């Protein structure tokens, strides 16, 4: 994931090396094929081919040739541009379905820069109504330009509950990403996390969940940011996140815990996305917002009590799953009372098969792809607590 402006060569090499000599597909909605020569011959990484497809309209999402190239790619790269084009052209079409299938079944490498990074999280700023500045977002978190989206789109490992942001230093976008997180918590009750990159900076996430940060520090002040609500607090919601009034998210000046990493040419500084509590080479900060202004201070490392093994007295009078046993088609889950934030379908070895965000409804329908015979578990997540 790159924050925009020009690409970082070492980070792009990291991406290409994980294509294992295969085919790279660049998808974009504007521009040309400038990535082809750069990826294929200028970085010294042996790959079979690079092809750029420019999707000029939603019609391209139904082009069999586009589908074929997605199915044959070992790596897919989303160029910069306008993320609303990507969302409106590809979401709920064969394009996002085939990309997600390639991620889950073939373990392809996926990445993007600028708008291409912005679409990789489970939550995303869709830019349907244009961009928004930090000052405008914090002045009114419900301005139409704060268009935070949770509709299922791309399912990238380790990014399910993450919203990304880019060009973080040009202009300063801390305030708007904090506003995105405040809206997600206020509207959906989900404590999402944020990953952000300055320009010329990249975050590369391995299959082990370790994020390496590339940049040109100390020559340039290139940063990545890993942002989360402060799990040490009993009350974590914003003090004020309403229509027409400035955002207040202070919580005694400790509302958000942030790990800041300087990006280096070797990518030696890291953050662990498995726990969101451990990093190497960075520093912890507190972020908070008072009357529409972002403030920060030094902080100790975050200390979260493990909660995924806790029990909870759920407000559920009845809980039904059918059909059981399940063969093919859809699984219906019904529950009376408080609906979960997330539903997770997983195999007995813990492998996650399907994840759906559920903002407090009373039933849901899961439609998993073909599954091998076996026993599967359904887990309901309430904040940080999971009931299986």
Write out the residue ranges for each language-model feature:
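Catalytic nucleophile loop
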Residues: 79-80, 103-124
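C-terminal and late-domain segments of enzyme folds
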Residues: 1-21, 132-306
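Glycine/threonine-rich flexible loop motifs
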Residues: 83-93
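A glycine- and small-aliphatic-rich helix-loop capping segment at beta-alpha/alpha-beta transitions
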Residues: 92-97, 124-136
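C-terminal outer-membrane/trafficking sorting elements
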Residues: 313-388
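Catalytic-core regions built around general acid/base machinery
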Residues: 69, 92-106
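Proline-centered loop/turn at the N-terminus of a beta-strand
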Residues: 23, 107-109, 193
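N-terminal beta1-alpha1 cap of cysteine-dependent amidohydrolase-like domains
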Residues: 1-79
